[in-house]
Design a protein with these regions (language model features):
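Catalytic core of membrane glycerolipid acyltransferases/transacylases, capturing the structured
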Residues: 1-25
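Non-catalytic C-terminal accessory region of glycerolipid acyltransferases
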Residues: 24-175
Length: 175
């Protein structure tokens, strides 16, 4: 994750931090920081549980156990914790700039019951993989009804003309 933070400085500006898996002390410090941050209801933690940023369609999705460990610690301290899988995809659909498509999965509640860490990690990975596959299928079929446009830049002049021409009804010649 350190390499990703260096390659994408926007992540660091957004509050991203890395977990140094080579140093057990640094890993535990990052986990403690995350659990403490979850104590504030205004905080949301976005996690890349694969341990590295991978392309959206990379399969199989495999998680490291850190997410489950963090969720266990937070649930033990605060009574429960909520997890939500988020599928993010970027594609060149209608213009020469990519569109970012984000889909939120169902909320998963983890109580202070201690689940089997390995099985729960696999469950979370399969849940995210199913959401990503559904999103990819919807995109490939042109189903965009569930998506809202959050930001749209002004169309180029030729795209505006193209949209106007599509609105004009042309009657057939009857031939």
């Amino acid at each position: 994750m350190v390499e990703e933070l260096n390659r994408f400085p926007l992540l660091r500006r957004g509050g991203a931090y890395n977990v140094n898996k080579k140093s057990p002390q640094a890993s535990m410090q990052a986990i403690k920081y995350t659990v403490d941050a979850l104590g504030d209801r205004n905080n949301i933690i976005y996690n890349f549980p694969q341990g590295i940023i991978k392309p959206p369609n990379f399969r199989p999705i495999e998680f490291q156990t850190g997410l489950t460990y963090i969720a266990e610690k937070a649930a033990k301290r605060y009574g429960k914790v909520y997890l939500m899988p988020v599928a993010v995809n970027y594609m060149f659909l209608r213009d020469n700039r990519p569109e970012v498509l984000v889909e939120f999965g169902d909320l998963i509640e983890l109580n202070d019951d201690k689940p089997d860490r390995k099985k729960y990690t696999e469950f979370l990975a399969k849940t995210l993989e199913a959401l990503c596959d559904k999103q990819f299928y919807d995109i490939s079929q042109g189903h965009f009804k569930g998506y809202d446009t959050l930001f749209q830049r002004k169309l180029k002049w030729y795209r505006r003309i193209e949209q106007r021409l599509k609105k004009i009804e042309v009657k057939g010649s009857g031939v």
